[in-house]
Regions:
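Anionic-ligand binding patches
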Residues: 2-4, 10-199
């Protein structure tokens, strides 16, 4: 099936495309279709924002559309940055500034209290309005410093996934305390919030 990916985020597009194409779908980005709309994320939940994005871009493209709204929820910050993850620093899409703010807000939080989870809501919608939203999570913790790697985007250098359990894919790589940014794309997809939502 040919699916429009409703995102302007290059990292998210890479992951959506990689996961969906492995399932046999053809993915075209909204940019490739000439759609420059950036739906306003006014929802208070990941699922509400995913639906807003999916509906808007589906109407503009006339195609089956998939949208993801995701973020990092930190226990010590009462779930923040949550739905505001992409604009935690005050403006949208500045990964460095968002990471800086998270590290600053976590500077006095001890190792045993740094629990967090990545959450993803993925909404698939057809031009007739029928839609389905699936949720995925990955538990872990916030690192004390950036654990940069060759992969990832957003908060990936600061998030260390837990070693326990398996994702919906049934696969579990040995993450060995590595951050999302240090995992290969296949390793991350096997356990990630987005991989779980799309499984």
């Amino acid at each position: 099936m040919k699916i429009c990916a409703a995102t302007g985020n290059a990292g998210k597009l890479r992951e959506l495309r990689r996961i969906l194409e492995a399932q046999g779908h053809e993915v075209v980005s909204q940019k490739e279709l000439g759609i420059t709309l950036e739906p306003e994320e006014t929802g208070t939940t990941f699922a509400a924002n995913a639906l807003i994005k999916a509906e808007t871009i589906c109407k503009a493209s006339g195609m089956a559309t998939i949208a993801d709204d995701s973020g990092l929820c930190v226990d010590a910050l009462e779930g923040a940055p949550g739905v505001y993850s992409a604009r935690y620093c005050g403006h949208h899409g500045d990964d460095e500034a968002n990471n800086d703010k998270l590290l600053e807000n976590m500077k006095d939080v001890p190792a045993g209290k740094r629990g967090a989870k990545f959450v993803s809501a993925v909404c698939f919608i057809l031009p007739d309005g029928k839609h389905l939203t699936c949720m995925g999570e990955c538990p872990g913790k916030v690192a004390f410093e950036r654990l940069a790697g060759d992969y990832g985007f957003g908060y990936d250098p600061l998030f260390i996934p837990d070693e326990c359990g398996v994702g919906k894919t049934g696969k579990r790589p040995n993450t060995e305390g590595r951050s999302y940014a240090q995992l290969t794309p296949d390793e991350k997809d096997a356990i990630s919030h987005r991989g779980n939502a799309l499984a």
